[in-house]
C-alpha cells in the first residue's frame, strides 16, 4: 500500500500551478496539465485549493509572500530596497510573468497582497512622522515600485535602445530612487 504525503502533493501541485499560470495565464491554464505535471490526481487540486480561482490566488500569494520574505522592506533605505527588488525581479522572471497575467486577467487583489502593502504604507507613515516630511506614503511606494519594475515593464523595443547592461540599469534605478527620496524627504516648513 502506498501512503500519500499530503504536504508533498500539495507542494507539487502549487509548483506545477506556478509554472502553468506563468506560461499560459489564468485563462489558458489547465487544471489537468497541472495535475499531470504534479503527478497528482486532479481531484486533489480541488481538495487542497478549492477551484481554479482559489488555486490562482494561492499562486499569487506564494509569489507575493516569497518576494516579501526575500526582499525585506526598508523604509529608511528605499534606494537599497529598490536595488534588492530590482535584483529579485531580474532573477525571478516566472513571478514577473505571473504578476503580468494577474494584472491582465484577474486584477482583484488578495488579502495577503493588501496586508503586505498596508504594512509598507504604515512603515512609510512612521518614517514620515519621525522626519517631519509631508510625502504621501502610498504615492512614494508606487513610485519606488515603478522604478524597480521599470526595466521589465518597458516595451522590448525601448529596452533594446537603452544603453547599458543589467548592472547599469540597476544603478540607474537606485539613482532615480535616491533623487526621488532626496526631493521629498525634506521636512516642509
Map each language-model feature to its residues.
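Basic, helix-initiating cap at the start of DNA-binding domains
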Residues: 1-24, 28-40, 53-58, 62
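Key DNA-contact positions within bacterial/archaeal DNA-binding proteins
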Residues: 43
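Alpha-helical DNA-contacting segments of helix-turn-helix folds
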Residues: 49, 56-63, 110-113
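Amphipathic alpha-helical linker/stalk segments
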Residues: 57-84, 117, 121-125
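Amphipathic alpha-helical segments used for helix-helix packing
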Residues: 89-114, 153-161
Amino acid at each position: 500500500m502506498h501512503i500519500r504525503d499530503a504536504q508533498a502533493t500539495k507542494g507539487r501541485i502549487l509548483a506545477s500551478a506556478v509554472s502553468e499560470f506563468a506560461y499560459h495565464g489564468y485563462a489558458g491554464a489547465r487544471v489537468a496539465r497541472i495535475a499531470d505535471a504534479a503527478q497528482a490526481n486532479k481531484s486533489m487540486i480541488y481538495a487542497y485549493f478549492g477551484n481554479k480561482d482559489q488555486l490562482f490566488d494561492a499562486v499569487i500569494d506564494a509569489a507575493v509572500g516569497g518576494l516579501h520574505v526575500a526582499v525585506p522592506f526598508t523604509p529608511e533605505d528605499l534606494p537599497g530596497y529598490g536595488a534588492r527588488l530590482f535584483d529579485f525581479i531580474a532573477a525571478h522572471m516566472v513571478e514577473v510573468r505571473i504578476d503580468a497575467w494577474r494584472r491582465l486577467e484577474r486584477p482583484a487583489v488578495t488579502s495577503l497582497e493588501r496586508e503586505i502593502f498596508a504594512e509598507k504604507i504604515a512603515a512609510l507613515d512612521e518614517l514620515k512622522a519621525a522626519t517631519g516630511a509631508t510625502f504621501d506614503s502610498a504615492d512614494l511606494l508606487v513610485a519606488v515600485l515603478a522604478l524597480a519594475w521599470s526595466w521589465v515593464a518597458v516595451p522590448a523595443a525601448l529596452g533594446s535602445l537603452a544603453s547599458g547592461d543589467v548592472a547599469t540599469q540597476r544603478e540607474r534605478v537606485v539613482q532615480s530612487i535616491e533623487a526621488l527620496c532626496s526631493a521629498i524627504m525634506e521636512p516642509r516648513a
